[in-house]
């Protein structure tokens, strides 16, 4: 009986032109490696018959444990020449052929496919070992003889594979078609392997692979089917799958990966396509960032806004873009894809705009009707926003405080001094005036809403038993603090400071206020007057009294009918004096409002005591640091004098022979007047006929031995005391001398 291996050797040596196909679910092709041993036709038919029993369902093979009995009769006579150390080349043929097991290889046991990384590794290995396999075929075609007694299925492609060619024609086209249909039903099951383990032979591997390109597999796989007729090859071409039986040598020396040739350039080109964007993307991002920065600078230089760019692009190129889109492009807040789309359009518009500004030409006929794209439009562009430096702004603020509305010549002078444009200075002053109106809006009555600040000095203690009412050794402060708003003029600040001259004898302190002319008058005597000119009182005393008038910063507008509160330091019994002129208060003002304005308790004053149109003079006790609320009354002739001692009201002790009312402190004597005394010039003849002298009774009884204090209220008319002169003086001499002086006035 002829040995099938002997008949296949000549065909293997000269059968390079014979082609075969190999298929598996992983789309791999393996270079054929011829072996000396071959299987008989009966073995192949039994092998193929067993394929019909394989049930491919789900992710596992139902016939994984089924065995395949292959009847093989090998009469190799050349086994005597093989080395005894090689169990695979023993001359004796075992009587019982072990069964072959059908199993899944590798990841197919769990129904998984090879990952792309594994496929790429196999591709690289196949490319590296392609030439080595070709050399191995030529070297071992004439010498190798192996007995393919058993085979084991494996999905590992990391070892070199040798193929066992079929010596007899086999009609397997229909079987492979069924196999393809079964594999299409279960895509996860890519391949299966037949294994034939033996006790004394290294297991050989049989891989049945399926490739989608059967035609190329026939051209590439050689020495597979040596004696396959043309009909069988045609059936293989039509059905596309092919079969490859490979065996693993006992001592593998190299690794091999078999892949289809046509998938190799695709697999190699795919990483290139993936890597290319990653390599080019950084450069594109840098280019986009640079273009966005350049675009913004050139756009601002041309005088176009982001909204203008969006409208111009819509009219020129038909793509409307909003101002937000242009802003996001400049800020690199758009996606990479959108920025790549927008970049060429913006670049084209920028070039066209620069050509328009430089050459004064139109780049497109549609630009004729586009406002702002022609030469005239460029000239009509709004100017760049002016940024004023800090030092220039400070100088402008100083000029604004001096003159809020300068003339054109003054604006030109300021612009020349600051090296600025005249139009910029003019606009700044206009905007500054509007800002001032927002900060200090004018009221309907034209009054100022800024309050008048009150300043009080530290109090100077005074002995309560001293008959002198005024003793001052330091500068005193006149404080104005309106409770009701001034309606006649806008008074920003009023501060009157009084100083006294100290002599060896008694001194007198006079603070005279002329509201329309000055805001502060300082004098050694106390003489408030609301008249237009400051008035100075002459006090008859043994010592000379000097009068000084000091005018501070003039008011921006006449004080008019304002109210002044005078606080003199060193006063304890009469801590403060509120002096006022004619104030603008409605005639129907309530008593409570006037009393609250005067800082008095409304319960102390009856409505009958307030005649229509009266002026209020309030002397309210308290410490020097306390703030007395001034009273703003209507322009009336009422004079209210409230004199309160630190321990109670001053009692009325006597009236002199001339009809003057004398207030005096009788020491521990009981107080006669327990409530404030109100003197109405319309009802009391004391204020209409003669001046009123308030003299301390204790000082009057002392005669010339001590100084006395007197308050002179001189009325210039019988109906009104609006222009009255109030004098508080500390003079030396007897009470009769003071009374005589009052009569002389």
Curated annotation (Swiss-Prot):
DNA-binding segment(s): 381-440
Biological process according to GO: negative regulation of DNA-templated transcription; regulation of transcription by RNA polymerase II
Post-translational modification: Phosphorylated by PRKDC.
Residues in POU-specific domain copies: 280-354
Native organism taxonomy: Eukaryota, Metazoa, Chordata, Craniata, Vertebrata
Chain intervals with Polar residues compositional bias: 1-26
Cellular compartment(s): Nucleus
Subunit field text: Interacts with POU2AF1; the interaction increases POU2F1 transactivation activity. Interacts with NR3C1, AR, PGR and HCFC1.
Similarity section: Belongs to the POU transcription factor family. Class-2 subfamily.
Highest rank taxon of the organism: Eukaryota
Name by which UniProt lists this protein: POU domain, class 2, transcription factor 1
This protein's UniProt keywords: Activator, DNA-binding, Homeobox, Nucleus, Phosphoprotein, Transcription, Transcription regulation
Coarse class of the protein's main subcellular location: nucleus
Cross-referenced Gene3D superfamilies: Homeodomain-like, lambda repressor-like DNA-binding domains
């Amino acid at each position: 009986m002829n040995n099938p291996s002997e008949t296949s050797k000549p065909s293997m040596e000269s059968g390079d032109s014979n082609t075969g196909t190999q298929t598996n679910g992983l789309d791999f092709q393996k270079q054929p490696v011829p072996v000396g041993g071959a299987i008989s036709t009966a073995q192949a038919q039994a092998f193929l018959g067993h394929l019909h029993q394989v049930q491919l369902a789900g992710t596992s093979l139902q016939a994984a444990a089924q065995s395949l009995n292959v009847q093989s009769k090998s009469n190799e006579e050349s086994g005597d020449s093989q080395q005894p150390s090689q169990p695979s080349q023993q001359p004796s043929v075992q009587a019982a052929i072990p069964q072959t097991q059908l199993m899944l290889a590798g990841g197919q046991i769990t129904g998984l496919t090879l990952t792309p990384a594994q496929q790429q590794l196999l591709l690289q290995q196949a490319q590296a070992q392609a030439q080595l396999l070709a050399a191995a075929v030529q070297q071992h075609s004439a010498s190798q003889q192996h007995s393919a007694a058993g085979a084991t299925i494996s999905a590992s492609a990391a070892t070199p594979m040798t193929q066992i060619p079929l010596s007899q024609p086999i009609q397997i086209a229909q079987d492979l078609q069924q196999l393809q249909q079964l594999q299409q039903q279960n895509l996860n099951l890519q391949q299966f392997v037949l294994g034939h383990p033996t006790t004394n032979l290294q297991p050989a591997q049989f891989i049945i692979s399926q490739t989608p390109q059967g035609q190329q597999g026939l051209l590439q796989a050689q020495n597979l089917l040596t004696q396959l007729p043309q009909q069988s090859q045609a059936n293989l071409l039509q059905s596309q799958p092919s079969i490859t039986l490979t065996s693993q040598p006992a001592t593998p020396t190299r690794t091999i990966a078999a892949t289809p040739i046509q998938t190799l350039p695709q697999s190699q080109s795919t990483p290139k396509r993936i890597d290319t964007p990653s390599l080019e993307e950084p450069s594109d991002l840098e280019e986009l960032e640079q273009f966005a920065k350049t675009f913004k600078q050139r756009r601002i230089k041309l005088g176009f806004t982001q909204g203008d760019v969006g409208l111009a692009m819509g009219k020129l190129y038909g793509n409307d873009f909003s101002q937000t889109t242009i802003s996001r492009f400049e800020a690199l807040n758009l996606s990479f894809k959108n920025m790549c789309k927008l970049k060429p359009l913006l670049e084209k518009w920028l070039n066209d705009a620069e050509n328009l500004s430089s050459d004064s030409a139109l780049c497109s006929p549609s630009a004729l009707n586009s406002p702002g794209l022609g030469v005239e439009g460029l000239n009509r562009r709004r100017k760049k926003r002016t940024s004023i430096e800090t030092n220039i702004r400070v100088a402008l603020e100083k000029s604004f405080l001096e003159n809020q509305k300068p003339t054109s010549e003054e604006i030109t002078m300021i612009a020349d001094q600051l090296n600025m444009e005249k139009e910029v200075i003019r606009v700044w002053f206009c905007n500054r005036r509007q800002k001032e109106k927002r900060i200090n809006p004018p009221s309907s009555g034209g009054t100022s809403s800024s309050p008048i600040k009150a300043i009080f000095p530290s109090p100077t203690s005074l002995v309560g038993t001293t008959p002198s009412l005024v003793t001052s050794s330091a500068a005193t402060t006149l404080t104005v603090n309106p409770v009701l708003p001034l309606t006649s003029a806008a008074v920003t600040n009023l501060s009157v400071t009084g100083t006294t001259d100290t002599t060896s004898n008694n001194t007198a302190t006079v603070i005279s206020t002329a509201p329309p002319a000055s805001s502060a008058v300082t004098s050694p005597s106390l003489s408030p007057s609301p008249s237009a000119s400051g008035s100075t009182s002459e006090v008859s005393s043994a010592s000379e009294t000097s009068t000084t008038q000091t005018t501070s910063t003039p008011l921006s507008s006449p004080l008019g009918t304002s109210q002044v509160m005078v606080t003199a330091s060193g006063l304890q019994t009469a801590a403060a004096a509120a002096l006022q002129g004619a104030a603008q208060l409605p005639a129907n003002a309530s008593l409570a409002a006037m009393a609250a304005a005067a800082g008095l308790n409304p319960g102390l004053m009856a409505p009958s005591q307030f005649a229509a149109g009266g002026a209020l003079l309030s002397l309210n006790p308290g410490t020097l640091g306390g703030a007395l609320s001034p009273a703003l009354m209507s322009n009336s002739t009422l004079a209210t004098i409230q004199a309160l001692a630190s321990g109670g009201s001053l009692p009325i002790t006597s009236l002199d022979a001339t009809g003057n009312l004398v207030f005096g402190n009788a020491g521990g004597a009981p107080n006669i007047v327990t409530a404030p005394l109100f003197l109405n010039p319309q009802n009391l003849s004391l204020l209409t006929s003669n001046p009123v002298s308030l003299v301390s009774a204790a000082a009057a009884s002392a005669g010339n031995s001590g100084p006395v204090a007197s308050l002179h209220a001189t009325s210039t008319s019988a109906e009104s005391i609006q222009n009255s002169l109030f004098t508080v003086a500390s003079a030396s001499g007897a009470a009769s001398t003071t009374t005589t002086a009052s009569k002389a006035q």
